[in-house]
Design a protein with these regions (language model features):
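Active-site and NAD+-binding cores of ADP-ribose-processing enzymes
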Residues: 1-121, 133, 156-312
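A short, exposed loop/beta-hairpin motif centered on an aromatic-Gly-Thr core
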Residues: 122-143
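Conserved structured core elements
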Residues: 143-147, 261
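Short active-site loop/helix that positions an aromatic residue
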Residues: 146-156
C-alpha cells in the first residue's frame, strides 16, 4: 500500500501544471495557454527564437517541464524513420515553363521559401518530407505518401508538381529527432489502461514480497518507489502527446500562417536548442501520412526517378 501511495503522490507531482487525470479540463487549459502563447508572439512580446522570454509563457514552461522528464521516450534516430520500411517523399511545385527538374530542384532554397512553414519562417532551408509505411500494392495511381506530400503543398487543380523519393545520408542516420506522433494510433482509454496494468503488476509484486517477508518474520524492505517512475512518465508523455495532437496540431488556413505557425516555430527552436536534428509530426491534412522536418537539409537526399504530376 505504501508503494501505491507513493505512485499516487508521484503522479500528482508530475501533473502539477496540467491535471492529466481530468482530460476535459486539461484540453481546455492546453488550448487556452496555446492561444496565449500565440498571441504573445503576434504582439511581438518576444521573437520566435527568443527562448529566454518564451520560456516564461505558461505553455512553453509546461512543455519544458514535461520534456525534461520524458524526452527519451520521444527520441528516434533519423535512420529509424528514413528506412526501407517507410516510403519517404518530397513534392515540389513547378512551373510549366521549367525544364525537366533535377535533384537540386527538389531541395529547399531560401529564395524560393516565401511563406511560413509549420516549424520554420520564410527563407529557412529546413527539409520537410512526408512518409508512410511502404505499400506493396498502392490502391491508386499515387501512393499514400505521395498523396500526403501533395496535400501538404495544398495542391490545387491545374498545378504541376515533381515527386521524388528521399533517403537518409548515412552520416546523419544516428542523429536524434523528436517524435510527436507516439500516441497517434492510441486512444486515451488505451493509454490509461496500460498505466493501470503496469502499476497493478508492480503493486502485486510488492505485496507478494511483503507477504513473504512477513511469513519469514523478517522486516520488509522499503518499497521501491523508482519502479513507478517509468510507467508514470510514459503515461504522461503519451497523454501529453495525444493532447497536443488533438488540440494543437490542426490544419491552418494560408491567410494566417505567420500568426498560427509562430508558436510551432518557437517549439522547433526549443527542440533545436536541445541538440536534436528534427521533428516528426502527424499530417493535419492527410491523416494516413506523417511528416518529418530536418533542421539540416543535407540529412537526406533525393533518390530514384522524379515523377511529374499534373493536378486535375
Amino acid at each position: 500500500m505504501l508503494a501505491y501511495k507513493s505512485y499516487v503522490r508521484r503522479r500528482k507531482e508530475m501533473c502539477s501544471y496540467y491535471d492529466f487525470t481530468g482530460r476535459e479540463k486539461t484540453e481546455a487549459t492546453i488550448v487556452k495557454t496555446w492561444a496565449e502563447f500565440r498571441q504573445d508572439l503576434a504582439n511581438h512580446k518576444f521573437a520566435y527564437n527568443d527562448l529566454e522570454r518564451a520560456l516564461h509563457t505558461t505553455f512553453l514552461h509546461v512543455f519544458d517541464d514535461v520534456f525534461q522528464n520524458g524526452h527519451t521516450l520521444l527520441e528516434k534516430r533519423i535512420g529509424d524513420i528514413l528506412n526501407a520500411e517507410n516510403h519517404v517523399v518530397r513534392a515540389a511545385r513547378i512551373n510549366p515553363s521549367e525544364s525537366a527538374p533535377n535533384y537540386e530542384r527538389l531541395m529547399p532554397k531560401s529564395e524560393c521559401i516565401k511563406e511560413d512553414n509549420r516549424f520554420s519562417p520564410p527563407r529557412v532551408e529546413w527539409l520537410y518530407l512526408a512518409f508512410a509505411s511502404r505499400e506493396k500494392f498502392p490502391t491508386g495511381s499515387l501512393s499514400t505518401v505521395e498523396q500526403c506530400a501533395l496535400k501538404e503543398c495544398r495542391a490545387v487543380s491545374g498545378e504541376h508538381f515533381a515527386l521524388c523519393d528521399f533517403k537518409a545520408n548515412e552520416k546523419f542516420a544516428n542523429d536524434l529527432v523528436i517524435d510527436l506522433t507516439i500516441a497517434k494510433n492510441t486512444s486515451f482509454d488505451e493509454i490509461n489502461a496500460l498505466l493501470e496494468a503496469r502499476t497493478s503488476q508492480i503493486e502485486e509484486e510488492e505485496t507478494r514480497k511483503a507477504v513473504i517477508y512477513y511469513l519469514e518474520k523478517r522486516r520488509p524492505p522499503v518499497a521501491n518507489k523508482e519502479r513507478y517512475n517509468f510507467p508514470l512518465t510514459d503515461w504522461v508523455m503519451h497523454t501529453y502527446a495525444k493532447l497536443l495532437a488533438d488540440q494543437i496540431f490542426l490544419p491552418v488556413d494560408s491567410a494566417d500562417k505567420s500568426v498560427m505557425y509562430a508558436p510551432f516555430q518557437c517549439m522547433a527552436q526549443y527542440i533545436l536548442s536541445k541538440g536534436y536534428s528534427g521533428i516528426v509530426y502527424a499530417s493535419t491534412v492527410y491523416p494516413a501520412g506523417n511528416n518529418i522536418v530536418l533542421f539540416d537539409k543535407t540529412a537526406a537526399h533525393p533518390c530514384g526517378k522524379i515523377h511529374l504530376i499534373d493536378i486535375s
